[in-house]
Every structure is written in structure tokens, then in C-alpha cells.
């Protein structure tokens, strides 16, 4: 019986003093929450801006890499049958006397001056 009375008196004292400090504790908790929120917000903003910077850098690098990996259109050299593919540089796709009569297709040749 004595132990029950001791526990009940401790319970009453804890409840009474706990309620007295509740207003102070709530204000402290609000301050702590606001400070944590501000710190979390700032901590989240820094990685977000870093993430955005990394994405911008990555997109420019991918564009450069895509340009580097893409080939120029293939072209045909001199004395090669042309048709669907263009001739390289200063060569012109013409029917010639030498090869044209055998294969019946135009060839990439140097343009004649005349």
C-alpha cells in the first residue's frame, strides 16, 4: 500500500510540474523546429543547385559527345561508282567513257576543265 501511495504521489508531482513547464517547452520546441527547418531547407537548396549545375554540365557534355560520335556522311573517292552516295571533295559524279560502258553507272571523277 505504501508503494502505491509513493507512486501516485510521484505521478501527481510529475503531472503538476510537467504542465507548468509545458508552455516553455512548446516555445522551445517551436524554435528548435523552425531552426531545423531552416537548416534543412538551406541544406536541401545547396545540393539542388549543385544538382542543377551538374545536369547542365552533363547535358553540354552529352551534346559534344553526340557531335563527336556522329559521322559525317560517307563520300566516295575517285573512280568509284556513284549513285546514292555523294562524291568526296572536288569530285563530280559523271558518266565516263572508261568505266561507264562496262558497268553502266556514273563514276566519281575530277571535273574536266573545258
Swiss-Prot record:
<feature type="disulfide bond">
    <location>
        <begin position="75"/>
        <end position="88"/>
    </location>
</feature>
<comment type="function">
    <text>Ion channel inhibitor.</text>
</comment>
<keyword id="KW-0960">Knottin</keyword>
<keyword id="KW-1015">Disulfide bond</keyword>
<keyword id="KW-0165">Cleavage on pair of basic residues</keyword>
<keyword id="KW-0964">Secreted</keyword>
<keyword id="KW-0800">Toxin</keyword>
<dbReference type="Pfam" id="PF08092">
    <property type="entry name" value="Toxin_22"/>
</dbReference>
<comment type="similarity">
    <text>Belongs to the neurotoxin 14 (magi-1) family. 03 (ICK-30-40) subfamily.</text>
</comment>
<feature type="signal peptide">
    <location>
        <begin position="1"/>
        <end position="20"/>
    </location>
</feature>
<dbReference type="GO" id="GO:0005576">
    <property type="term" value="C:extracellular region"/>
</dbReference>
<keyword id="KW-0732">Signal</keyword>
<dbReference type="InterPro" id="IPR012627">
    <property type="entry name" value="Toxin_22"/>
</dbReference>
<dbReference type="GO" id="GO:0019871">
    <property type="term" value="F:sodium channel inhibitor activity"/>
</dbReference>
<keyword id="KW-0872">Ion channel impairing toxin</keyword>
<dbReference type="GO" id="GO:0090729">
    <property type="term" value="F:toxin activity"/>
</dbReference>
<protein>
    <recommendedName>
        <fullName>U17-barytoxin-Tl1a</fullName>
    </recommendedName>
</protein>
<feature type="propeptide">
    <location>
        <begin position="21"/>
        <end position="74"/>
    </location>
</feature>
<feature type="disulfide bond">
    <location>
        <begin position="82"/>
        <end position="93"/>
    </location>
</feature>
<feature type="disulfide bond">
    <location>
        <begin position="87"/>
        <end position="108"/>
    </location>
</feature>
Amino acid at each position: 500500500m505504501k508503494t502505491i501511495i509513493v507512486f501516485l504521489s510521484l505521478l501527481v508531482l510529475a503531472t503538476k510540474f510537467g504542465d507548468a513547464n509545458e508552455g516553455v517547452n512548446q516555445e522551445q520546441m517551436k524554435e528548435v523546429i523552425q531552426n531545423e527547418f531552416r537548416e534543412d531547407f538551406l541544406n536541401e537548396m545547396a545540393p539542388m543547385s549543385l544538382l542543377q549545375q551538374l545536369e547542365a554540365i552533363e547535358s553540354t557534355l552529352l551534346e559534344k559527345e553526340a557531335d563527336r560520335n556522329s559521322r559525317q556522311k560517307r563520300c566516295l573517292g575517285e573512280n568509284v561508282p556513284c549513285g546514292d552516295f555523294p562524291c568526296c571533295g572536288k569530285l563530280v559524279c559523271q558518266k565516263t567513257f572508261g568505266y561507264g560502258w562496262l558497268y553502266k553507272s556514273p563514276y566519281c571523277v575530277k571535273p574536266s576543265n573545258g
